[in-house]
Amino acid sequence: MKRTDYLDRLLAKFGSSFDIYMPYQIHGIEYPAFAYHYTHQEKYVLVKEANMWKADSYEYVLFVNTEVIDEAVIEKAKDIIENYFEPELVRKGEKYPAKDHMYSYLTVVIIGNHYSDSKLASKVKRYHFDKGYQFSIRGYSAGRMVAVTMDDEKVITNNAASKSKKVFKAVFDEVRANKPGFSTICEKQGVTPFKQEL
């Protein structure tokens, strides 16, 4: 299966609840796509002015398309989660996230043909990044890593991303069943992906 076909269908799944940006740059390096989701919840008594609590949740997903998943690719994914997503998108350069921040999921999805070394799959599985703010009063951030290989159609995730494994696995069958990809859906609906403001 072609990586581009897999990614196109995967973006169609994300596109139903995420804003999709194509392409997306991080520190001068261009990636095929980025997905963003935001949820705001609040509880109030009778009128909105009598607010009991508010909670904001975020998900950031970067999609990486590479022929071979090697150690450098995995290390770069870790770097993006820990040194771009968390400080720049979650905290926006501040000491803590915004007041009503509940959680942020920081995900890098690596799509490749195969690993340069089969032992690298365990590096993806073992990856862990979890950061709380003010004893979790300002919520937390969790790093999630997903690696998908075309040659053997396997999906490897770290523990934080394990619940989403079925979603990524199902894409293989959906591509074979000729389900529409993101580009086809956009064309039919006459819409285009979001553009990153640089």
Whereabouts are the PLM-identified features?
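Short, flexible beta-strand-to-coil junctions
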Residues: 56-58, 62-69, 111-115, 140, ...
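Charged, structured surface patches that assemble and position nucleic-acid processing machinery
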Residues: 125-195
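N-terminal, charge-rich interaction modules
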Residues: 1-68
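Intrinsic-disorder-associated interaction segments
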Residues: 3-7, 70, 74, 157-164
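Catalytic cores of nucleic-acid endonucleases
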Residues: 68-126
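Exposed acidic/polar residues on beta-strands and adjacent loops within beta-sheet cores, strongest
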Residues: 49-55, 113, 118, 156
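Short glycine-rich, low-complexity/disordered patches
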Residues: 20-31, 89-107, 111, 134-141
